[in-house]
Regions:
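N-terminal cap/lid segment of alpha/beta-hydrolase-fold proteins
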Residues: 139-178
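Short beta-strand element of the alpha/beta-hydrolase
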Residues: 180-189
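Cap/lid segment of the alpha/beta-hydrolase catalytic domain
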Residues: 189-244, 315-318, 424-434
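Alpha/beta-hydrolase active-site loop
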Residues: 238-260
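Catalytic active-site module of serine/aspartate enzymes centered on a nucleophile-bearing elbow/loop
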Residues: 421, 427-454
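Short beta-strand/loop motif that positions the catalytic acidic residue
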Residues: 377, 383-385
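Accessory cap/linker subdomain of secreted extracellular hydrolases
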Residues: 285, 295-376
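Primarily recognizes the serine-hydrolase "nucleophile elbow" in alpha/beta-hydrolase
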Residues: 255-317
Length: 454
């Protein structure tokens, strides 16, 4: 089976695998042959019922799993560990009938589930009949128009993607009134994110859009290129962060500036996580096109090399495990040996794949001096950090503080009690904090709104 590539995961894989939710996009090796397949909705129904039943370990013994899913299970304490990771949702009350769909070009099955604390769809992603990933999504049996927010309106607006002869669907959220309004473009973190940056029960970009619109600021968010065109991009060996993130953010700024109710002189760019890391590159790309944003907001952005960040995340998540088996330690050692190759990216052939991304992706990042470029930025910049973030930590925040301490155009704020998604949680929860039903903290929205309105 052909390997499936890379830029559609990276940090997302680090996050999701430790909740028992394997990212689909990393290389997937051929599964064992003498095992059952998930090929139809009734298979998915049975698989989920076993997972949530008394003997989830049967899934490892009887059903096909890709190597990546096996790794996720190993690092989660087996399928029982995966089932336990869903405990934050409460006890299972109802399992609905599965229906078939597609995620990133992979066959997927959506199973509506009602738990005592929340209702979600469990999404089972398959590759040639083998289970390749498990994640959560919005509950599809939820009543429409439930708790609709007020005080703004939404308009569908797509970002053109000429090199793929397509577009990225998006939503422009507008305050009430005629405008022209200040506006902000939201730029996703790593992984194949939708316009809401949905992760488990959280939708931080939707929260930001609605919260800022209520403060008189328009917000433009769009589905990420790897979310819409993941199947086309998996074999693009030459793809870099420019293709994955930067060029589309620039196009979004340009299309937003053309909207009648938007003030083109007051457009800001907000990047989260890897999107925040990309902000200096976005600023330079806008300058190269003889345009500019009015200012920039970076949320949970790391100034450190991505490989180093991945290593730290794995170390931390392993530390949360009550016991590390020999097999789990061997898996970790193998991953770290792979990450060690990033210390000499020039030695990599273009078709070498490290942690789910081809060598050109890593070579571009190795040449990207984010701290130096940030120091050279002239526009007002706001950098925000959650103090309970285990993915991008206060160590990263202190690096920014030291590098930017003499830069009058930079403002840095950290928030006690907030996670990587700026929702309430504790670092010691790890990814289980994202199973909570939370929204982006109001203080974060107020601080962003105040910065934009200055």
């Amino acid at each position: 089976m052909k390997k499936r590539a890379g830029i559609i995961t990276i940090l997302t894989a680090v996050l999701l695998m430790f909740t028992g939710i394997s990212a689909f996009g990393l290389p997937l090796a051929a599964p064992d042959k003498a095992e059952r397949e998930v090929a139809a909705p009734e298979d998915a129904d049975e698989w989920i019922r076993i997972l949530l039943g008394d003997h989830p370990e049967e899934l490892e013994e009887q059903w096909k799993l890709t190597d990546q899913m096996k790794l996720a299970a190993t690092m989660s304490g087996g399928m029982k560990g995966i089932a336990d990771s869903l405990a934050a949702l409460g006890t299972i009350e109802t399992i609905g009938s599965a229906y078939q769909g597609e995620v990133q070009g992979f066959q997927a099955f959506f199973i509506p589930c009602v738990f005592s604390a929340a209702s979600v769809d469990l999404i089972l992603v398959t590759d040639q009949g083998a289970v390749a990933g498990l994640t959560t999504g919005p509950y599809t049996n939820a009543p429409e128009n439930e708790e609709q927010a007020e005080g703004f309106e939404t308009v569908e607006l797509a970002v053109p993607v000429p090199d793929l002869n397509g577009e990225l669907p998006g939503t422009l959220t507008l305050p009430e009134g005629e405008g022209p309004f200040p506006a902000v473009v939201l730029v996703h973190g790593s992984g194949p994110n939708d316009r809401d940056e949905t992760l488990m029960n959280l939708k931080p970009f939707r929260d930001l859009a609605e919260g800022l619109a209520e403060n008189g600021i328009a917000v433009y968010r769009y589905d990420k290129r790897t979310y819409v065109y993941g199947a086309q991009m998996v074999n693009d060996i030459q793809a870099t962060l420019m293709d994955e993130t930067v060029e589309d953010a620039v196009a979004a700024v340009q299309i937003l500036a053309q909207q009648e109710r938007i003030d083109p002189s007051r457009i800001f760019v907000l990047g989260h996580s890897l999107g925040g890391n990309a902000v200096p590159a976005i600023d330079q790309a806008l300058k190269d096109r003889e345009t500019a944003a009015c200012g920039y907001i970076l949320l949970a952005a790391s100034p450190r090399p991505l490989g180093e960040l991945m290593r730290q995340q794995y170390d931390y998540l392993y530390s949360l495990m009550p016991e590390v088996t020999q097999e789990q330690q061997e898996e970790k050692d193998a991953l770290f040996r792979e990450l060690d190759r990033l210390q000499d990216p020039d030695s990599l052939a273009d078709d070498d794949m490290i942690a789910g991304a081809y060598a050109p992706y890593w070579k571009w990042l190795a040449d990207y001096d984010v701290l130096h470029m940030a120091e050279e930025m002239e526009k007002p910049c706001l950098l925000l950090q959650g103090e309970e973030d285990y993915q991008v930590t206060m160590e990263d925040f202190r690096i920014w503080q030291d590098a930017l301490k003499d830069k009058a155009n930079w403002q840095l704020i950290s928030y006690p009690g907030l996670t990587h998604l700026f929702t309430a949680g504790e670092k010691t929860e790890g990814p289980k904090a994202y199973l909570r039903t939370e929204k982006v903290d109001d203080k974060v929205i107020r601080d962003i709104a105040g910065f934009i309105k200055k």
